[in-house]
């Protein structure tokens, strides 16, 4: 047999001894099986139990037929190849394999020059990702385009086809990575739940303009809540989303978000507008966040958050992190970072959101118009020099205004070896105030030295517990600081407050944060930490810490209205934390008044997470006379596919529920159903209820109101159920 025009019998060895009248019996060359040549001019590789040349230019193959060309593989019971037309006909158990798609059918007719043709009764499956379906036929238009008639699509298994998309005509354009469906209906458990006469969607992960899945929910304060986002893929590096929102009790809210990512700039900007019939006023929100890289060392940016009224977030959001906001930031800034110095220029102000039901108003922070900062660090042999300096103009509508200039150079000498460290440090804190005319003293100067000595050692030993090898450490630490008294009663409070007493705060020279107060200090902090580290994994199983501060002189510098300290010791601090087992973690801390024998502050936290979809969290927070809260949350399987979620955050001090949440989730294998009820305190004596109901179809999208952000924030360790059970 000679090679015919346009056709190559390759990957075959001819067994001449078996040649008979019935035709030639051919064997495969396994080394060449699966070989492909790119392009339309690539040869066709053919193998079969039987191959006949029935006429001039006609080749027929029967029995386990395999034909391969340029990455396309054809399998069938019978195949006819017309070398003159360069076309193929295949019948009986036809299978077409491509890199990302596998299709079976009854018959195939295709022109190998134009890739046009038809496959009858196709059943298709994507390779490497979920997704399958069938159709009445596939019409191949050219190399990149084909269409399916009367098609279906689903990510469900054949045994449990709970949902599928029914499409009258589906056009696929691989050149543009776009699919277009005509007269598509979504059926769930046999019931049509959604219909569209036309829809266009991207193939793969590419972005494409179009309507996104709507969200539907309900809240007590706003009623029925429907959002229909429209996505605009303007360019590969910037896009926009328009999200009209219908609130049955308030009206239609219009919102839009614009994002961009350039080589030297990025930003996210959002605006919202609502003509609120319930509040009888127009309401709006603006959030602008942009940053720019001016050169390798210098960046600039702006942040602008503003809303029309104090209750905007409380009325229109369901996230506690949003409804609890009290100050919105507005600032522009420029920073530069170099090897031994850095600088910053910033202008900043705030919008304060008041709670009309609160007994006391929220204090409005000072604006910094502007704020300039310079920092430096340099090493000279064993000595380390640092400089912190700033100049700020503080503005406020009702309080004393003025300018503060501050400089704090320090020199330290760290002495470190394998057993411990000793670090003496000396600094000079200098501050100048130029106040407005309403102040008692227009110009104030404050200078004082600050000396500290930090030291610690580390002891360790091997130990064995419950058959596991550990390394136990004992780490005592002693910290001394001295700063003389300076009268600061005439200095206003621009940005200064008292640091929360904590383990980290005990090793700082100043108990105040901000530059308006420098404490007088002659004090010694003594602490010890012990760690239990698993030898094989290096995992810290347990850490125990104790610490206390001792004062050698009475306190004289305080904040206005705060009495000075009378005791010569601080409260005792204790903390226990660690991953005590594979599933259990604890984080606890206590502040204990040794003079009166009472607990001043207490934080207890524990979490149990034996596996995905199994999480229990417990927290208790107590601050004497101000706070006492319990916080319990969990996600846990209730059956083979059922999961329950809840959170209970209660304030005993205020005798109210801060946040309550209860939800159920069902995993159907290729879909998930979630329903969540949430009650959230939005004001001192008010709360709002929200109901979420969402159907997620794997590989297709989500329908309904989205509770995922609420669940992930309210239930630490939460995992969507369809991320736990593998999709069939």
Curated annotation (Swiss-Prot):
Keyword check for Glycoprotein, yes or no: no
State any GO BP term from the record.
lipopolysaccharide transport
Domain of life, per lineage: Bacteria
Q: Which residues form the signal peptide?
A: 1-21
Mind telling me which InterPro entries this protein's record contains? LipoPS_assembly_LptD, LptD, LptD_2, LptD_C
The answer to whether the entry has keyword Transcription regulation is no
Keywords carried by this UniProt record: Cell outer membrane, Membrane, Signal
Q: What does this protein do?
A: Together with LptE, is involved in the assembly of lipopolysaccharide (LPS) at the surface of the outer membrane.
Indicate the family of this protein: Belongs to the LptD family.
What protein is this chain from?
Answer: LPS-assembly protein LptD
* Record lineage: Bacteria, Pseudomonadati, Pseudomonadota, Betaproteobacteria, Nitrosomonadales
């Amino acid at each position: 047999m000679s090679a015919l025009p346009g056709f190559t019998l390759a990957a075959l060895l001819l067994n001449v001894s078996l040649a008979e009248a019935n035709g030639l019996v051919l064997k495969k060359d396994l080394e060449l099986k699966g070989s492909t040549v790119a392009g339309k001019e690539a040869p066709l590789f053919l193998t079969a139990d039987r191959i006949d040349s029935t006429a001039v230019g006609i080749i027929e193959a029967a029995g386990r037929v395999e034909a391969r060309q340029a990455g396309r593989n054809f399998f069938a019971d019978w195949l006819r190849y017309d070398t003159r037309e360069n076309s193929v006909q295949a019948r009986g158990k036809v299978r077409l394999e491509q890199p990302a798609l596998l299709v079976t059918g009854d018959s195939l007719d295709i022109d190998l020059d134009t890739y046009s043709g038809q496959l009858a009764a196709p059943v298709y499956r994507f390779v490497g990702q979920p997704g399958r379906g069938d159709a009445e036929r596939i019409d191949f238009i050219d190399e990149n385009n084909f269409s399916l008639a009367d098609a279906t699509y689903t990510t469900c298994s054949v045994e449990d086809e709970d949902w599928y998309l029914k499409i009258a005509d589906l056009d696929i354009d691989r050149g543009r990575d776009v699919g277009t469906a005509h007269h598509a209906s979504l059926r769930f458990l046999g019931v049509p739940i959604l219909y569209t006469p036309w829809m266009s969607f991207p193939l793969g992960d590419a972005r494409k303009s179009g309507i996104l899945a709507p969200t539907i929910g309900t809240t007590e304060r706003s009623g029925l809540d429907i959002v229909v986002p429209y996505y605009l893929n303007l360019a590969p590096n910037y896009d926009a989303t328009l999200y009209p929102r219908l609130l049955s009790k308030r009206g239609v809210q219009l919102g839009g978000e614009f994002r961009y990512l350039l080589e030297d700039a990025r930003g996210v900007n959002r605006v919202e507008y609502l003509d609120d019939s319930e509040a009888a006023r127009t309401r709006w929100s603006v959030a602008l966040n942009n940053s720019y890289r001016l050169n390798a060392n210098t960046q600039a940016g702006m942040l602008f958050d503003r809303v029309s009224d104090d209750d905007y977030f409380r009325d229109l959001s369901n996230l506690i992190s949003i409804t609890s906001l009290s100050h919105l930031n507005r600032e522009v800034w420029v920073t530069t970072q170099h090897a031994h110095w850095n600088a910053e220029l910033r202008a900043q102000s705030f919008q304060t959101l008041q709670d009309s039901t609160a007994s006391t108003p929220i204090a409005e922070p000072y604006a910094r118009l502007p704020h300039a900062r310079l920092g430096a660090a340099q090493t000279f042999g064993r000595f380390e020099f640092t400089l912190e300096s700033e100049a700020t103009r503080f503005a406020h509508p009702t309080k004393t205004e003025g300018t503060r200039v501050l400089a704090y150079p320090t020199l330290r000498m760290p002495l470190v070896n394998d057993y411990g460290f000793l670090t003496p440090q000396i600094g000079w804190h200098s501050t100048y105030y130029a106040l407005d005319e309403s102040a008692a003293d227009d110009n104030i100067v404050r200078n004082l030295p600050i000396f500290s000595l930090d030291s610690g050692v580390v002891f360790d030993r091997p130990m064995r517990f419950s058959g596991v090898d550990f390394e136990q450490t004992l780490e005592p630490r002693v910290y001394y600081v001295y700063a003389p008294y300076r009268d600061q009663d005439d200095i206003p409070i621009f940005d200064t407050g008292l640091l929360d007493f904590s383990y980290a705060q005990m090793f700082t020279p100043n108990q105040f944060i901000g530059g308006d107060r420098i404490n007088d200090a002659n004090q010694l902090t003594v602490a010890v930490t012990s760690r239990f580290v698993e030898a094989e994994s290096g995992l810290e199983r347990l850490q125990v810490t104790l610490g206390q501060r001792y004062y050698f002189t009475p306190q004289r510098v305080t904040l206005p209205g705060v009495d000075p300290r009378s005791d010569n010791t601080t409260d005792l601090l204790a903390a226990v934390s660690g991953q005590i087992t594979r599933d259990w973690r604890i984080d606890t801390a206590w502040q204990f008044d040794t003079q009166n024998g009472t607990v001043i502050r207490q934080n207890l936290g524990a979490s149990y997470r034996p596996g995905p979809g199994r999480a229990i969290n417990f927290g208790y927070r107590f601050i004497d006379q101000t706070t006492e809260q319990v916080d319990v949350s969990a996600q846990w399987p209730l059956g083979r596919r059922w999961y329950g979620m809840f959170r209970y955050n209660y304030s005993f001090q205020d005798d109210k529920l801060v946040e309550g949440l209860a939800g159920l989730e069902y995993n159907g294998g290729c879909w998930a159903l979630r329903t969540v009820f949430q009650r959230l305190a939005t004001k001192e004596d008010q709360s709002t209820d929200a109901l979420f109901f969402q159907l997620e179809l794997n590989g297709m999208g989500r329908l309904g109101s989205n509770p995922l952000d609420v669940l992930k924030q309210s239930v630490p360790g939460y995992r969507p159920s369809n991320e736990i059970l593998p999709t069939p």
